[in-house]
Amino acid sequence: MKLPKEGDFITIQSYKHDGRLHRTWRDTMVLKTTENAVIGVNDHTLVTEADGRRWVTREPAIVYFHKKYWFNIIAMIRDNGISYYCNLASPYVLDQEALKYIDYDLDVKVFADGEKKLLDVDEYEIHKKEMHYSPDIDYILKEHVKILVDWINNGKGPFSQSYVNIWYKRYLELRSR
């Protein structure tokens, strides 16, 4: 499949391990694609939940997806600084319809002051049993929590202020065309 280009809009679809559609983001603007990664931006983007509820994102957010890492990163640009929401998830696939991944419940939230919280551990344990996550998936996800925390602690990639600034500036340039 042909990769989307800078300025293109794509749909993002999050699934659960059992194949159910979990959440959809419509019209994410692509800022960069490589063989292994997609960087985009959501800004007042329509989100549809599995139960049909809809909402619109409140602030601009740089989104980062990678084909080798079992997480994706959302850098939310707020008045008090950058906050992050990181989903432990399968590496993405991209087809004609959307960028797609499996959401594995565990999330890491990083507040603007740098505080980190691991979220939804109970939900993960319940779904691990209900949806029969394999021991391999359990191991991979726990290892990728460690990798993610290392990225956070070392300001790697999306956790660097300059990274967010560069991609937000590029978004503003594209938006004003």
From Swiss-Prot:
Keywords: Hydrolase, Magnesium, Metal-binding. Its cofactor is Mg(2+). Its EC number is 3.6.1.15, 3.6.1.6. GO terms for molecular function: magnesium ion binding; nucleoside diphosphate phosphatase activity; ribonucleoside triphosphate phosphatase activity. Mg(2+) 1 binds at residues 87, 103, 107. It comes from Streptococcus thermophilus (strain ATCC BAA-491 / LMD-9). Has nucleoside phosphatase activity towards nucleoside triphosphates and nucleoside diphosphates. It comes from the Bacteria. This is Nucleoside triphosphate/diphosphate phosphatase. Pfam families: DUF402 (PF04167). InterPro entries: DUF402 (IPR007295), FomD-like_sf (IPR035930), Ntdp-like (IPR050212), SA1684 (IPR016882). Belongs to the Ntdp family. Gene3D superfamilies: FomD-like. NCBIfam families: PRK13662.1. The active site is at 23 (proton donor). PANTHER family: PTHR39159, UPF0374 PROTEIN YGAC. The lineage of its organism: Bacteria, Bacillati, Bacillota, Bacilli, Lactobacillales. It catalyses: a ribonucleoside 5'-triphosphate + H2O = a ribonucleoside 5'-diphosphate + phosphate + H(+); a ribonucleoside 5'-diphosphate + H2O = a ribonucleoside 5'-phosphate + phosphate + H(+). Mg(2+) 2 binds at residues 105, 107, 120, 123.
